[in-house]
């Protein structure tokens, strides 16, 4: 007997709660369940374990939860926009733009504060998205996903080349940038930038209310127009959603690959193509993957730590190979 969609949502929610608790408990210092409960409900500022749980571990768990959900939903929206099951937010050049601004800030402007770098990465992601969409629509008023994808690929290669050139000329700063370039949520403090958390949450909620429009848009532009939808405006809203969600994620965690590609495909294999279900389910799966990958990154070479982007890259590559082997794609 197959499970109903609501059951899948419940299971994904339960998994998210479990991995979140594990994230608070696992690391170089193991925290027992009684200690965790004590830290959460009877906090003692003089207790090192309580400070660890509610400080760095809570912060990185929240960052992993938010970035995983944001990247996954941005990937789902990208696949709707392009009607391509292997599309991901990176096609807009978001990663390349954000990383370029981070590298420029550290090496040329000498910016080292986490808050300032997050702002620079976020602005870079948004500006590059605007540039890509502008080039994709150059000399034509109509939004064509194929042209935008080509523009995104070109701009990504251009900014990647700029980034590599700057790094080669400033090798002294390379070590400090490696973790950010590889994708990492260690040494991040969400409490220093609560506004970024608010932005991601607001756009995730707004994405859910876009679901009815996405259901219609997935038929065809002509049918959507015939049903009274303003297709051009919907596509521009989708572009905004992708750029803000993906840009926020890259700003917080660096360049994380594959989450926006594999999670929407997995969600569409499990649930029917109704975006009222797919959007929250995709967000839950993305959060579960990011938190799980972060846990693995902490313990696999303990006491050292791997960038979480390496773990998501390995997992994503394996899942993508499996999907390609099975020929399973559905938009």
Which residues make up each language-model segment?
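Alpha-helical transmembrane segments in inner-membrane proteins
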Residues: 1-331
């Amino acid at each position: 007997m197959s499970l109903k969609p609501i059951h899948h949502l419940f299971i994904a929610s339960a998994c998210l709660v479990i991995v979140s608790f594990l994230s608070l408990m696992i690391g170089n210092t193991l925290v027992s369940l009684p200690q965790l409960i004590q830290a959460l409900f009877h906090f003692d500022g003089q207790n090192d374990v309580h400070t660890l749980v509610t400080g760095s571990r809570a912060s990185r768990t929240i960052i992993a939860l938010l970035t995983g959900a944001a990247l996954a939903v941005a990937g789902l929206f990208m696949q709707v926009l392009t009607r391509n099951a292997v599309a991901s937010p990176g096609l807009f050049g978001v990663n390349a733009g954000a990383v370029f601004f981070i590298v420029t800030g550290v090496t040329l402007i000498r910016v080292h504060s986490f808050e300032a770098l997050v702002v620079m990465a976020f602005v870079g992601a948004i500006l590059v998205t605007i540039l890509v969409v502008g080039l994709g629509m150059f000399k034509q008023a109509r939004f064509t996903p194929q042209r935008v994808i080509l523009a995104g690929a070109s701009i990504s290669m251009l900014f990647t080349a700029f980034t590599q050139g700057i790094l080669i000329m400033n090798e002294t700063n390379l070590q400090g940038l490696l973790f950010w370039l590889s994708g990492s949520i260690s040494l991040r403090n969400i409490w220093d930038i609560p506004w970024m958390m608010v932005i991601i949450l607001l756009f995730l909620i707004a994405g859910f209310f876009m679901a009815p429009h996405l259901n219609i848009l997935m038929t065809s532009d002509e049918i959507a127009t015939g049903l009274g939808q303003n297709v051009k405006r919907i596509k521009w809203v989708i572009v905004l959603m992708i750029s803000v969600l993906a840009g926020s994620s890259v700003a917080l965690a660096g360049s994380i690959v594959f989450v926006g590609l594999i999670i929407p495909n997995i969600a569409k294999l499990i649930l029917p193509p109704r975006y009222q279900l797919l959007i929250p389910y995709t967000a839950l799966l993305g959060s579960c993957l990011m938190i799980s990958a972060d846990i693995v990154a902490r313990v696999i070479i303990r006491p050292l730590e791997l960038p979480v982007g390496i773990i998501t890259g390995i997992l994503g590559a394996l899942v993508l190979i499996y999907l390609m082997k099975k020929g399973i794609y559905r938009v």
